[in-house]
């Protein structure tokens, strides 16, 4: 996309506020919990949508809430699905992929990206570039927005949590969608282990909310404010802020590792990694929200968004250990991370930043072994 991202004349990027902010609960007058009623529309490239896929998997909701994946290439009309008119829709793959952790996209199962030279922006590889939209045959995410609200006039973003019964958008704010998925709303449809999974435990909620607040502004959104800056002074301010807060995360994780090493001994790495998280000694929403930025940092943000003081692997040993622990030891993280979609989306969609559309092959590997 070649249009400007800055708001006004100061050259600073401003993120759009989400428009659909409902929830799902037994008490809600419209949106009641039900198996098969709700659907997620996501991009595997998008860090905000990635949050929802990880949460959906960790909570055991893949069989409860289906998922469709848009094409990695974002053009002037927005996110799009594959045209499936010529596909065999009764194939076994077609029937099963909706409830896969990554919507059936095959490259999400791979831990290393490949050559991109022969891949065109209009590539139509089923369950590689995208899936179709199975309910209405829509070609664009925008079609869902207009179906929900014919007067909608803002940008067409993902993720979208959709209600098939009322044919409306429940919510398009990722931070709220993951809270909906983590709530007890769908407990009757999952097993006991997943019922016990709580990504925002009451005793840690205040700490999680505080951590999320500064991570969002300075890291999650900070890389975008850096990469989309249209004045040098804005860029320099934002990139310094990103790395100041990565330093803060590194200190938190360094201190955490030291305490765990003292508790378990340096040799018991399995026990150390079992409690090596950002807030508390268990996996929480704070880890999910930070992960989706950190996993994209070396492959994309270092070069594409000019966040190039250092890389995670070279400059932040404890963040590097933390992100590899999540990727290699938790399927919900690993199998929703698609390095092909991530690299192709940013380098092919942001023509103002990368006008030739050449996708860098490095770093190699996309993620190092644990």
From Swiss-Prot:
Homodimer. SUPFAM superfamilies: GST C-terminal domain-like, Thioredoxin-like. GO terms for biological process: cell wall organization; glutathione metabolic process. Glutathione binds at residues 15, 79, 155, 158, 173-174. Induction: Under oxidative stress conditions. By agents such as diamide, 1-chloro-2,4-dinitrobenzene, tert-butyl hydroperoxide (t-BOOH) and cadmium in a transcriptional factors YAP1 and/or MSN2/4-dependent manner. Belongs to the GST superfamily. Omega family. The active site is at residue 46. Keywords: Cell wall biogenesis/degradation, Cytoplasm, Oxidoreductase, Transferase. The keyword Transferase applies. The gene is ECM4. InterPro entries: Glutathione-S-Trfase_C-like (IPR010987), Glutathione-S-Trfase_C_sf (IPR036282), Glutathione_S-Trfase_N (IPR004045), GST_Omega-like_C (IPR047047), GST_Omega/GSH (IPR016639), Thioredoxin-like_sf (IPR036249). One of its GO terms (molecular function) is glutathione transferase activity. The keyword Cytoplasm applies. Its EC number is 2.5.1.18, 1.8.5.1. Active as '1-Cys' thiol transferase against beta-hydroxyethyl disulfide (HED), as dehydroascorbate reductase and as dimethylarsinic acid reductase, while not active against the standard GST substrate 1-chloro-2,4-dinitrobenzene (CDNB). May be involved in cell wall organization and biogenesis. Residues 201-353 form the GST C-terminal domain. GO terms for cellular component: cytoplasm. This is Glutathione S-transferase omega-like 2. It catalyses: RX + glutathione = an S-substituted glutathione + a halide anion + H(+); L-dehydroascorbate + 2 glutathione = glutathione disulfide + L-ascorbate. It is found in: Cytoplasm. Pfam families: GST_C_2, GST_N_2.
């Amino acid at each position: 996309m070649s249009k400007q991202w800055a708001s006004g004349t100061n050259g600073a990027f401003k993120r759009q506020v989400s428009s659909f902010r409902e929830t799902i609960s037994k008490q809600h007058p419209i949106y009641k919990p039900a198996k098969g009623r709700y659907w997620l529309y996501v991009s595997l490239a998008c860090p905000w949508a990635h949050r929802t896929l990880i949460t959906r998997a960790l909570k055991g909701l893949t069989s409860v809430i289906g998922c469709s994946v848009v094409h990695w290439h974002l053009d002037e009309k927005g996110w799009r699905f594959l045209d499936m008119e010529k596909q065999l829709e009764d194939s076994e793959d077609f029937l099963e992929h909706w409830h896969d952790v990554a919507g059936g996209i095959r490259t999400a199962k791979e831990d290393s990206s490949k050559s991109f030279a022969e891949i065109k922006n209009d590539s139509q590889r089923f369950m590689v570039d995208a899936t179709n939209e199975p309910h209405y045959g829509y070609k664009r995410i925008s079609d869902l927005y207009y179906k929900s609200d014919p007067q909608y006039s803002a940008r067409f973003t993902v993720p979208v949590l959709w209600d098939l019964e009322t044919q409306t958008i429940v919510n398009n704010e990722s931070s709220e969608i993951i809270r909906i998925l983590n709530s007890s709303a769908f407990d009757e449809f999952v097993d006991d282990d997943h019922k016990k999974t709580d990504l925002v435990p009451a005793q840690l909620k205040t700490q999680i909310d505080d951590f999320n607040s500064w991570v969002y502004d300075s890291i999650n959104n900070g890389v975008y404010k850096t990469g989309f800056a249209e004045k040098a002074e804005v860029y320099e301010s934002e990139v310094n802020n990103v790395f100041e807060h990565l330093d803060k995360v590194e200190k938190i994780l360094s201190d955490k590792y030291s305490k765990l090493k003292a508790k378990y001994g340096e040799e018991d790495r399995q026990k150390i990694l079992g409690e090596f998280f950002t807030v508390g000694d268990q996996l929480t929403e704070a880890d999910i929200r930070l992960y989706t930025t950190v996993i994209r940092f070396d492959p994309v943000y270092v070069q594409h968004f000019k966040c190039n003081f250092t890389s995670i692997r070279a400059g932040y040993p404890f963040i590097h250990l933390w992100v590899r622990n999540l990727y290699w030891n938790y399927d919900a993280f690993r199998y929703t991370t698609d390095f092909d979609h991530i690299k192709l989306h940013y380098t092919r969609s942001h023509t103002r930043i990368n006008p030739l559309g050449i996708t860098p092959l490095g770093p190699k590997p996309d993620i190092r072994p644990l």
